[in-house]
Amino acid sequence: MPVLTTDAESETGIPKSLSNEPPSETMEEIEHTCPQPRLTLTAPAPFADESSCQCQAPHEKLTVAQARLGTPVDRPVRVYADGIFDLFHSGHARALMQAKTLFPNSYLLVGVCSDDLTHKFKGFTVMNEAERYEALRHCRYVDEVIRDAPWTLTPEFLEKHKIDFVAHDDIPYSSAGSDDVYKHIKEAGMFVPTQRTEGISTSDIITRIVRDYDVYARRNLQRGYTAKELNVSFINEKKYRFQNQVDKMKEKVKNVEERSKEFVNRVEEKSHDLIQKWEEKSREFIGNFLELFGPDGAWKQMFQERSSRMLQALSPKQSPVSSPTRSRSPSRSPSPTFSWLPNKTSPPSSPKAASASISSMSEGDEDEK
């Protein structure tokens, strides 16, 4: 693609090849050999002094509109972001993610200031420079890490690393005798703002540690660190260890209370189950009792049946006194008829009675015939 062949500087001090001023020199076709964005995350990002841009073609300046439209594969948009990155946290990662995704084809360079510069202009850090460098190398959005980055970006630095845009949050960063160290970058049209993540910062993390210093000191003493390593006095060491013992005792008491509550809850559950089962058994027993001994129970019916049988056995039914005369069958002989004859020894009381008895006997004989 066409590139500029001049290194003249603009009025802002930024080389014309890196400023927004339109090029005035002739352009020639030179192939770019700039490093490409990382395609794999199986290895950390390289350092700039180990794999710097060796492209011999002069770096043509891009506008924000051109960069957002996209660039050829061999000409990625080189975006620069810098910082201290102490106690690397999610706020840092989100800022780098925004810088990486500003343009479709971008190559993210991250500059990390050294301990000397940081201690001089900002203050002491928790992590040393080597640890901070390594933290950035293992961030997935970073393509290249620049060690010992300058506090204020110079034209020489921008030209050396062929930087197209600088990404940072838009809050003025006053330091090193300047109200805003990115002022000249903004004037050159090379500044692209990112959004700061609220609620998380290195200062907030350090504030938490300082606020709960006793807790963390006791924690590390319990984990085997010595009072000398923690810079703790003899008296404080004994105090922290005593507090640890008190906490252990509280924890034991708490565990006993929890177990006791758990035991009581289990007993209550069991008693509730037993009461419920007892009520069910009681209802079942009462129902069975009523079925057996109730007013219409089986026992009463059985008793009545037994009683009726006993009564029948003790007092059987009597046969009828008289029965109708059955017709005799012609094949059977008639039953003999017995006549009541007067007793020979007892004479009739009177002649009338004797005649009456004789007449009745004669009538009986006629009826049988």
UniProtKB/Swiss-Prot annotation:
In which pathway is this protein known to take part? Answer: Phospholipid metabolism; phosphatidylcholine biosynthesis; phosphatidylcholine from phosphocholine: step 1/2
Report the locations given in the UniProt record. Answer: Endoplasmic reticulum; Cytoplasm
- For the keyword Chloroplast, the answer is no
Provide the disulphide bond pattern: none
Segments for region (Disordered) = 1-27, 309-369
| Listed GO CC annotations | endoplasmic reticulum
In short, the EC number is 2.7.7.15
Positions of post-translational Phosphothreonine modification: T345
Q: Which residues bind phosphocholine?
A: K122, W151
Molecular function in Gene Ontology: choline-phosphate cytidylyltransferase activity
Reactions this protein catalyses? phosphocholine + CTP + H(+) = CDP-choline + diphosphate
Q: Which residues carry this modification: Phosphoserine?
A: S315, S319, S322, S323, S329, S331, S335, S346, S349, S350, S355, S360, S362
> Which residue stretches does the UniProt record annotate as biased composition, category Low complexity?
319-339, 351-362
Q: Which UniProt keywords apply?
A: Cytoplasm, Endoplasmic reticulum, Lipid biosynthesis, Lipid metabolism, Nucleotidyltransferase, Phospholipid biosynthesis, Phospholipid metabolism, Phosphoprotein, Transferase
Question: Which Pfam families does the annotation name?
Answer: CTP_transf_like
Q: What happens when the gene is disrupted?
A: Female mice lacking isoform 1 have reduced fecundity due to failure in ovary maturation. Male mice lacking isoform 1 have reduced fecundity due to testicular degeneration.
**Any one GO BP annotation for this protein:** CDP-choline pathway
Record-listed CTP binding positions: I84, F85, H92, K122, H168, D169, Y173, Q195, R196, T197, I200
Superkingdom as given in the UniProt entry: Eukaryota
Its family? Belongs to the cytidylyltransferase family.
Q: Which PANTHER family match?
A: CHOLINE-PHOSPHATE CYTIDYLYLTRANSFERASE B, CYTIDYLYLTRANSFERASE
Relate the assembly described in the record.
Homodimer.
Task: Please identify the protein, giving its name as recorded.
Answer: Choline-phosphate cytidylyltransferase B
State the organism named in the record.
Answer: Mus musculus (Mouse)
Q: Which gene encodes it?
A: Pcyt1b
